[in-house]
């Protein structure tokens, strides 16, 4: 039985040099189709091998929540498009040291709890090596992104194969910060703009920056660089952008038709592959048992290999239930539009 369980997890099949070469191949403009195919295979394996370290850290975070139902914890492997985009934007980055191939989201009601739980994790008896903290709450990104990130280098006493510079990022954020981040991603998905990467229409980016500053004021923390810490001024500029471009109405209009069995039929912990066709606005969901990580990874890789031809976006997530999945990834269900818009319209009334 233990042998079967060990086979669930992918091992690293390539050297550090091969992994970094794969990143450089993706980055180059003159790479051949054959070189790109091999590079993608290497990236898929390096990413999939992070599933075990990610699982270990995810389970520790789950235990930290106790019986709290207002805390969401999910894990995800970074999307191939996001990996490629990051490699091309950051020329000096080695794929071997990309810190968010595996990531956990830990979502709590208040900023105080963000810092308290992050400190609790840092002071716990984990064997992983603490690397760094990124405080985007006290120092928000110019894009408007606000969250607290901890980065750890995974260490295992029992599975030495994973002690290979596998970095896992934990994102601690409030529900309000999560609403903003997923609304931005929703707008990006359905308008086909890479807003998360700082690309897209200037007025769309400015709208989200201003709303993020409003939310920062609400939480009592610094506003985004280039905006005023003045609620009336922020609201006035948001109103002007919305009057010109109708972004609130656009977000409210986004709908997704769920093309799956009733979520309650698989409302349990495990792996979910969310497959969103943003041309038809349809979402398919595939559920896998916790022991079926290899099958889930295989499907995820297959879908991503055809992503450009099919207009499909996919993500592989582990969650405790279907309800937690929907709450943590509302952008794939387009549930975020109503809630985000309601919050914004409170200010615009």
Regions flagged by a language model, labelled:
Residues 1-39, 162-272:
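An acidic, glycine-/histidine-flanked metal-binding catalytic module
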Residues 309-348:
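Short, mixed-charge low-complexity intrinsically disordered segments
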Residues 109-113:
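Helix N-cap motif at beta-to-alpha junctions
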Residues 292-307:
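A short, charged, amphipathic alpha-helix used as a generic interaction element across diverse proteins
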Residues 2-86:
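Intrinsically disordered, low-complexity polar/charged tails and linkers
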Residues 282-291, 315-317:
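A short, exposed loop/beta-hairpin motif centered on an aromatic-Gly-Thr core
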Residues 88-99, 274-275, 302-306:
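Short, flexible, solvent-exposed loop/turn segments with mixed acidic/basic and small polar residues
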Residues 121, 127-159:
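Short Gly/Thr-rich strand-loop-strand
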């Amino acid at each position: 039985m233990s042998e079967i369980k060990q086979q669930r997890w992918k091992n690293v099949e390539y050297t550090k040099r091969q992994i970094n070469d794969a990143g450089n191949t993706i980055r180059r403009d003159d790479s051949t189709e054959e070189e790109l195919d091999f590079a993608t295979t290497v990236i898929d394996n390096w990413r999939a091998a992070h599933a075990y370290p990610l699982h270990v850290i995810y389970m520790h975070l789950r235990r930290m929540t106790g019986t709290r139902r207002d805390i969401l914890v999910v894990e995800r492997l970074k999307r191939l498009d996001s990996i490629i985009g990051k490699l091309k934007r950051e020329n000096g980055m080695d794929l071997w040291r990309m810190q968010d191939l595996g990531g956990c989201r830990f979502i709590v009601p208040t900023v105080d709890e963000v810092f308290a739980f992050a400190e609790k994790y840092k002071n716990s008896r984990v064997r992983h090596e603490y690397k760094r903290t990124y405080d985007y709450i006290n120092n928000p990104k110019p894009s408007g992104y606000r969250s607290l990130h901890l980065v750890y280098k995974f260490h295992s006493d029992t599975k030495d194969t994973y002690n290979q510079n596998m970095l896992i990022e934990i994102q601690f954020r409030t529900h309000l910060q999560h609403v903003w981040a997923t609304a931005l991603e929703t707008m990006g998905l359905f308008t086909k703009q890479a807003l998360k990467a700082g690309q897209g229409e200037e007025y769309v980016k400015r709208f989200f920056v201003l709303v993020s500053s409003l939310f920062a004021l609400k939480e009592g923390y610094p506003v985004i660089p280039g905006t005023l810490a003045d609620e009336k001024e922020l609201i006035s500029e948001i109103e002007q952008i919305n009057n010109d471009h109708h972004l609130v109405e656009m977000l409210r209009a986004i709908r997704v038709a769920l093309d799956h069995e009733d979520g309650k039929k698989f409302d349990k912990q495990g792996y979910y592959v969310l497959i969103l066709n943003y041309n038809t606005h349809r979402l398919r969901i595939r559920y896998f048992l916790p022991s079926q990580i290899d099958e889930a990874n295989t499907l995820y890789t297959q879908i991503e290999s055809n992503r450009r031809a099919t207009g499909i976006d996919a993500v592989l997530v582990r969650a405790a239930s279907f309800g937690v999945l929907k709450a943590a990834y509302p952008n794939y269900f387009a549930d975020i539009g109503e809630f985000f818009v309601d919050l914004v319209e409170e200010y615009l009334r």
